[in-house]
């Protein structure tokens, strides 16, 4: 399978760097090829066009993240522990790869409707993890019965996503991972003074 070949991943990793540095619209396939250390034509053995590279990049990176997350949350007992893990892993992934953070938080957002639909399809695995955590939490009594799981999932993902976007927009000047517990507590306890 060509996706597992080393050159495929070289191109994916090079695309992350080039797109982060130049922006998606200013990133030519030739720049990606040069960064990857391959001939321009080699790119087309793996990808149809630049848009395909962007989608594949997101699918590859998010797919790996989702697979690891599905395994890691099995080791956690409660919904709160699982949610804490999702938040910290999400923040750690992007804090550890500044270029990937720029691509996922800024460049993917500037794409056309068709591209956004493909990205949303890839995100379904992540959202399913959140749905599972919420559903298990309701069943165990940890989360209140009658919770609108879909709305809660959107709010959780939106909070995580916006926290990362703000960090990227602020030139990554502070410790994103250090915000994990604060974000968790806000999501779990809300703003109500009990």
UniProtKB/Swiss-Prot annotation:
Domain HTH tetR-type: 5-65
Major localization class: cytoplasm
GO BP: any one term: fatty acid metabolic process
GO molecular function: DNA-binding transcription factor activity; transcription cis-regulatory region binding
Subcellular compartments: Cytoplasm
DNA-binding region: 28-47
InterPro entries, A to Z: Homeodomain-like_sf, HTH-type_Tx_Regulator, HTH_TetR, Tet_transcr_reg_TetR-rel_C_sf, Tscrpt_reg_YsiA_C
GO CC terms, sorted: cytoplasm
Keyword Repressor recorded: yes
Statement: the UniProt record of this protein carries the keyword Transcription regulation: yes
Keywords, alphabetical: Cytoplasm, DNA-binding, Fatty acid metabolism, Lipid degradation, Lipid metabolism, Repressor, Transcription, Transcription regulation
Function as written in the Swiss-Prot or TrEMBL entry: Transcriptional regulator in fatty acid degradation. Represses transcription of genes required for fatty acid transport and beta-oxidation, including acdA, fadA, fadB, fadE, fadF, fadG, fadH, fadM, fadN, lcfA and lcfB. Binding of FadR to DNA is specifically inhibited by long chain fatty acyl-CoA compounds of 14-20 carbon atoms in length.
Oligomer and partners: Homodimer. Binds to DNA.
Protein name: Fatty acid metabolism regulator protein
Organism name: Bacillus subtilis (strain 168)
Name of the encoding gene: fadR
């Amino acid at each position: 399978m060509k996706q597992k070949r080393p050159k495929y991943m070289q191109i994916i990793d090079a695309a992350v760097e080039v797109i982060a540095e130049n922006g998606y619209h200013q990133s030519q396939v030739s720049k990606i090829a040069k960064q990857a250390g391959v001939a321009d034509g080699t790119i087309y053995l793996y990808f149809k066009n630049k848009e395909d590279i962007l989608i594949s990049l997101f699918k590859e990176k998010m797919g790996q993240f989702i697979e690891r997350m599905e395994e890691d949350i099995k080791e956690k007992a409660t919904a709160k522990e699982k949610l804490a893990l999702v938040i910290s892993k999400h923040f750690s992934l992007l804090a550890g790869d500044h270029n990937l953070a720029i691509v996922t938080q800024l460049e993917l957002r500037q794409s056309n409707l068709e591209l956004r639909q493909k990205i949303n399809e890839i995100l379904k695995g992540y959202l399913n993890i959140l749905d599972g955590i919420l559903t298990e939490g309701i069943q165990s009594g940890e989360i209140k019965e009658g919770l609108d799981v879909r709305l809660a999932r959107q709010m959780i993902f939106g909070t995580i996503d916006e926290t990362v976007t703000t960090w990227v927009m602020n030139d990554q000047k502070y410790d994103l991972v250090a915000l994990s517990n604060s974000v968790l507590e806000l999501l779990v306890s809300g703003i109500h003074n009990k």
